[in-house]
Amino acid sequence: MATVLIVGKPNVGKSTLFNKLVRKKKAIVEDEEGVTRDPVQDIVEWYGKTFKLVDTCGVFDNPQDIISQKMKEITLNMIREADLVLFVVDGKRGITKEDESLADFLRKSNVDTILVANKAENLREFEREVKPELYSLGFGEPIPVSAEHNINLDTLLETIIKKLEEKGLDLESKPEITDAIKVAIVGRPNVGKSTLFNAILNKERALVSPIPGTTRDPVDEEVFIDGKKYVFVDTAGLRRRSRVEPRTVEKYSNYRVVDSIEKADVVVIVLDATQGITRQDQRIAGLVERRGRASVVVFNKWDLVEHREKRHDEFTKLFREKLYFIDYSPLIFTSADKGWNVDRVIDAINLAYASYTTKVPSSAINSALQKVLAFTNLPRGLKIFFGLQVDIKPPTFLFFVNSIEKIKNPQKVFLRKLIRDYVFPFEGSPIFLKFKRSR
């Protein structure tokens, strides 16, 4: 796929331009310099044409620290490999020595370049005061745009497409598929894991290519379902440790199951509906929760349950009571043998993965915190100042408090509930908490 790179000195609006062209708020936009450190990329689709767009950090003429130097090196290396560069300058203030230095590097790199004058909301002023000096950079006619106000972006896109097609690049191909969602199917022996695994793979809409596995190892299958890529892992049944002989194949298979959970994004926990929820089911669910993996709970063999039409509430209550520590998981009733509700399992996996990879703004967290603390009594002497999300997979939140010692399990339950009820439900995903002392 053709790659188009956005480059320029800091704070000329590169990330705003990137977000508008990909039609997502993917790159962080702030007024301060150096907000973008790592390259951010996404696919641009425009009238059936597609290309990869990459937003880079601002290139400093003379980096003042090691990080800035490394950022500059990464950007300059990417320029050499790009099919096309969008060289963004400030359409209000004109060019500086930093612009001239970067222009010199671009010319020496012999890379195709489009000169983009951003922040050109006042076109007459731009034409009169800024445009004439831009020709000195050596890239011909500049394209004036205002990313913030969506001015002239169509003209820019037309020019990009034209330049790429002149190079003979294929723009008709579909966007590259992102990394696969890794799904492990786990449970006790004989609960129907392999049957569910096969039911998912046998969907008519699924294109399956096998990844070779080894006997007693987890069996992997790479699957495309509705354009999404998954790797499903069918694992061996997990028995209680006391029932597994040491130094046996089963013992090592259990290690492999745990390893599969570690490598998964989403774990489907399969239960035998004819047997309810056993202690071993609870242990397996606890293992998944402690490893911080997203989860979906499946009551399989639902076709064998007597009077099943009237027993959904009964089994849902059982789930909430015995697997209360993962009660955020979607609950699905299936018969893998008959193909019942396999679609719902796939939908639940997608939901859990979306939650697992969601990041919420700090403003939403602290607004909810302020609102709830107004009518909540914390332990005497405890103060929670503010919080922010610091990671995904799983969603992890850092709260600044005056005393970490006063944070006990009830306070952790309170904060998780606050996040799910007032910020984002994170259905299917655990929430991890961290605390830092602050005054």
From Swiss-Prot:
InterPro entries: G_ENGA (IPR031166), GTP-bd (IPR006073), GTPase_Der (IPR016484), KH_dom-like (IPR032859), KH_dom-like_a/b (IPR015946), P-loop_NTPase (IPR027417), Small_GTP-bd (IPR005225). GO terms for biological process: ribosome biogenesis. Residues 358-439 form the KH-like domain. GTP 2 binds at residues 187-194, 234-238, 300-303. Residues 2-168, 181-357 form the EngA-type G domain. Keywords: GTP-binding, Nucleotide-binding, Repeat, Ribosome biogenesis. GTP 1 binds at residues 8-15, 55-59, 118-121. Signal peptide: none annotated. One of its GO terms (molecular function) is GTP binding. Associates with the 50S ribosomal subunit. NCBIfam families: GTPase_EngA, small_GTP. Belongs to the TRAFAC class TrmE-Era-EngA-EngB-Septin-like GTPase superfamily. EngA (Der) GTPase family. GTPase that plays an essential role in the late steps of ribosome biogenesis. This is GTPase Der. It comes from Thermotoga sp. (strain RQ2).
